[in-house]
């Protein structure tokens, strides 16, 4: 029997409607949640992501501002703008769209965002808080993946989980969240000799590498949950993930599609993080 789909669009819609209600209650108290988005340069993919984030804010009763800058913006000018947003009481979340042009130090920029407004969860203070089990913000993509696992009531305590990919944005925080939920976690990276040797024993596989068809049916334990974070293009230019969807679907118990899986959840959890920041600021 084919795996049950975990529909990211449907789950995102449900969480967004709850977020919109909470946002409306805050707005009534004079604390409308506000997200500031900064885009530097003309990267086409970044423009799409930013547009989707701003639209999600508008559709759910959040205030949003979008600062677009040319690719030759100086690092000093960007840091000055971030500092102004740090001081703005109407802004509860600050998001700098990555990647940034090469002459700008991304690490320095992310560290300039006030930790209480770092709704991406990338600031070193928030990364450290995640490590100790008391995060102010969970990074949006791993947070969305955890909500998807929660939606199918998958018992993570004692489960074996394998995260394929060790990035600071997805892989590492994903592993920490799974660990905190009681799973036994293995992280595979580009140096891992035989990824399949790890994934074949896993109850949960999270693929977050950016390499299409990396996870095939013979690498998946029957009945496992497979979360596909990858965003790639096939030979026809069609969106696909890191998982061979057609093959793995015949083996897994649950699987997320691409598109329509993790993607909508990432933006949804950005709204949730912004909302939580606004609620903390409102007291």
Swiss-Prot record:
Its EC number is 1.5.1.5, 3.5.4.9. It comes from the Bacteria. SUPFAM superfamilies: Aminoacid dehydrogenase-like, N-terminal domain, NAD(P)-binding Rossmann-fold domains. It holds the Pfam family THF_DHG_CYH. Keywords: Amino-acid biosynthesis, Histidine biosynthesis, Hydrolase, Methionine biosynthesis, Multifunctional enzyme, NADP, One-carbon metabolism, Oxidoreductase, Purine biosynthesis. GO terms for biological process: L-histidine biosynthetic process; methionine biosynthetic process; purine nucleotide biosynthetic process; tetrahydrofolate interconversion. NADP(+) binds at residues 165-167, 190. Belongs to the tetrahydrofolate dehydrogenase/cyclohydrolase family. This is Bifunctional protein FolD. It comes from Cupriavidus necator (strain ATCC 17699 / DSM 428 / KCTC 22496 / NCIMB 10442 / H16 / Stanier 337) (Ralstonia eutropha).
